Amino acid sequence: KLDKGDRIRTAKDAHAFVRLGDGSVIEMKDRSEFYLTKNSLGTTIHLNRGAIVVEAAKQGKQHLFVDTGDGSHVSVTGTVFSVNSGTKGSRVSVIEGEVHMDHAGSERVLRGGEQATTSASIERIPVKDEISWSRKAARYAETLSAFNSLNKELGKVAQPGVRNSTHLLDLMPEGTIVYAALPNLTSTIVESHRIMQERINQNAALREWWAKEASG
């Protein structure tokens, strides 16, 4: 059991898994250090140095936060992501789900496969390379690949053309200045749903993700 303010460190070539009371799991790379605090908003992981991968459990009304000490805060309610903190700043990478990253008063939403840094001097690298040290790297890489393929396929779904005329226009009140006609999205939604269900049935990583989403 961890007491408030207890610091957890890993030595050179060491590795550790820490399970929180809410079910979240923190995987630590060697030469990493963090401590925990908790308040009415949720639990905060204060990452002093090193790299971690967090499998955040569903948080309900609270959130799980990561404070990197350089003015950057990451907020999640249930997702898988990594944070790498060093002297130049931090790099946040999302494996699954989405995180809200607040740095210097500016908030950004990151989703699976995306990455952000707190300084322009920090190089961006592929997410799969960022978490290659993890004991679960192969599974994470499979998840990233599955979502990347799914997003590409969904991006190819034909979008309806712009509607610039409609029989309803004649029914508009006299004097109407602006009329906006939305395209019919039914076929697009149906096709996207079909593709998602098909890929979920075919891919174990997507099935695992879908099962977690459905249970939440």
Set out the residue ranges of the language-model regions.
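Flexible, surface-exposed loop/linker segments and immediately adjacent secondary-structure boundaries
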Residues: 1-137
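Structural boundary/hinge residues at secondary-structure and domain interfaces
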Residues: 138-216
